[in-house]
Amino acid sequence: MKLPIYLDYSATTPVDPRVAEKMMQFLTLDGTFGNPASRSHRFGWQAEEAVDIARNQIAELVGADPREIVFTSGATESDNLAIKGAANFYQKKGKHIITSKTEHKAVLDTCRQLEREGFEVTYLAPQSNGIISLQALEAAMREDTILVSIMHVNNEIGVVQDIEAIGEMCRARGIIYHVDATQSVGKLPIDLSKLKVDLMSFSGHKIYGPKGIGALYVRRKPRIRIEAQIHGGGHERGMRSGTLPVHQIAGMGEAYRIAKEEMASEMARLRTLRDRLWNGVKDMEEVYLNGSLENGVPNILNVSFNYVEGESLIMALKDLAVSSGSACTSASLEPSYVLRALGMTDELAHSSIRFSLGRFTTEEEIDYTIQLVRKSIGRLRDLSPLWDMFKQGVDINSIEWAHH
């Protein structure tokens, strides 16, 4: 077993060796290096064929028509293109958008930008289990609501939203529904031929494909229109200009092909490992599970260890690559906005750790993790005056701290 142990698969994944091998075929002179938009010679045709194959592989995993898949530079761009693109195109129908407070920053910051441009956005608070109440969503819908953006799986706590029911509600009212599926694709079955979802964002690097490539599903029946955000050449049916990076697209296609084949067995294995990890730490004092084991993806476990500071815990766990909050926001020392939105105290949110497991996680690594966590928590609590006070029965919330 090699240290440190990587348990941050929700931040990114290593490229699967099969994917890396596939990508190598599209880089050098002796490979298929052409521009897929070059229509006048074989180099271009072969590159275009590789893109078509990948587009089909992605469409097959999610039950879409390949013509509904638009390649982007990643899920962040897909979220931007979907939300800004739909808002700009349909703004004559209304300027109201609904999303949730626990979305990824790529959705929240995009909505904030649209607010600056004159749109109105309702940010729904989830219930304490992380799920958006369908009644609250319905109550927020108005005559001028044009777009709802609610993710499939949350990147911090792994809870799964009922995108099927939300889709039905939106379709019945003629509202466009966008789903960020970055954390669910390849982990949960998605069938867009049955779901009433109009726009869906995908990433390559969260399921063992390369970074810097993603896709946006844009429904054809009923036809959804979006306004392009990047212009120049009219690639990707006019929705996203720019020379297609064939090596990255082929890599993403291969990653999605592998996911389709291995998803069922891989998720069963990860569920066993995640449950093993939780069972190994849940009997400690003041340990809380954030999210839900029943209604969550099998690869994410978010746990709060009360009376232990998250930052010091991460330092103590230096042999584990884990995160507190998500990588996109962990550069700041603010407690996780997702956990705060669940109604958690700052202290408890600050003491949370996200363990995310993946294809190369082993049972041996999980057992080592359990031992290390138990040892580290014990040591940090021995050093903590707050833990002493808690053990003596002092109500810490009632203490008035001196302001120096």
Swiss-Prot record:
InterPro entries: Aminotrans_V_dom (IPR000192), Aminotrans_V_PyrdxlP_BS (IPR020578), Cys_deSase_IscS (IPR010240), Cysteine_dSase (IPR016454), PyrdxlP-dep_Trfase (IPR015424), PyrdxlP-dep_Trfase_major (IPR015421), PyrdxlP-dep_Trfase_small (IPR015422). It comes from the Bacteria. Signal peptide: none annotated. Pyridoxal 5'-phosphate binds at A75, T76, N155, Q183, S203, G204, H205, T243. It is found in: Cytoplasm. Keywords: 2Fe-2S, Cytoplasm, Iron, Iron-sulfur, Metal-binding, Pyridoxal phosphate, Transferase. The active site is at C328 (cysteine persulfide intermediate). One of its GO terms (biological process) is [2Fe-2S] cluster assembly. Its cofactor is pyridoxal 5'-phosphate. Belongs to the class-V pyridoxal-phosphate-dependent aminotransferase family. NifS/IscS subfamily. HAMAP family: Cys_desulf_IscS. Master enzyme that delivers sulfur to a number of partners involved in Fe-S cluster assembly, tRNA modification or cofactor biosynthesis. Catalyzes the removal of elemental sulfur atoms from cysteine to produce alanine. Functions as a sulfur delivery protein for Fe-S cluster synthesis onto IscU, an Fe-S scaffold assembly protein, as well as other S acceptor proteins. Homodimer. Forms a heterotetramer with IscU, interacts with other sulfur acceptors. This is Cysteine desulfurase IscS. It comes from Serratia proteamaculans (strain 568). The gene is iscS.
